[in-house]
Amino acid sequence: MKKLIILVAGISFFYGCKKSDAGGGGTTADTYLNTKAASSWNYHETNSSSGTPQNSDYSLVSTSRDTSINSKIYHIYSFSYGGSQYLAINGHDYYQYDSVPGALGQIFERLYLKDNINANSSWSQQIAVSIPGLPVTIPVDINNKIAEKGISKIINGATYNNVIHVSTTISSVAIPSASLTSDINSYYAPGYGLISNTTLVHLDYAGVKQDVNIVTSLNSASLK
């Protein structure tokens, strides 16, 4: 059970920390994913999960490389602190393929954005997680909703238009809902992709307490 709790906390960091679904800008100006080589994004992150805010800056750079995963073409991005990001667009659906901290090396394909559905529309994914010592997989539900669409948002003094706001919650039948609360909000702009993310998760169950409080915002971008 403790491993499951650690996993759920890890999934929260998957949204909120530096390996979030940063990137974007569009294969065209109307999409939310930029695959053009040498495009770059500079982000600022404030991590208050431990109670004391920790600030850091990092950049994401689009490479000239792609790879095929699950019959989709994923574009590869490089982080300034090391490591890669894999993002794909299939029609109007946007995917991230990555390992999740605490998931014991398991890798997931996450549908993080649908740009052609109306505000208040929703979609969900259920991740089947294998926990050593348990004979069955444990389901973890990721619930997404288009909270707002076509809005304008100011981030670090810059105004972005036609922004999509996605709200996300995380739950599991193995953890009582009162013991796991989450409020994850991501904002995407055409021509830029992710411009802002806030991740708030509180977990208090079976003697384990975990808080995730991370804010990520776009400082600047150089799009090719």
Regions found by a protein language model. Name each.
Residues 18-224:
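Conserved functional acidic sites
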Residues 13-16:
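C-terminal motif of bacterial Sec signal peptides marking the signal peptidase cleavage site
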Residues 5-9:
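Sec-dependent signal peptide hydrophobic core
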Residues 1-4, 18-19:
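Positively charged n-region of N-terminal signal peptides that target proteins for export
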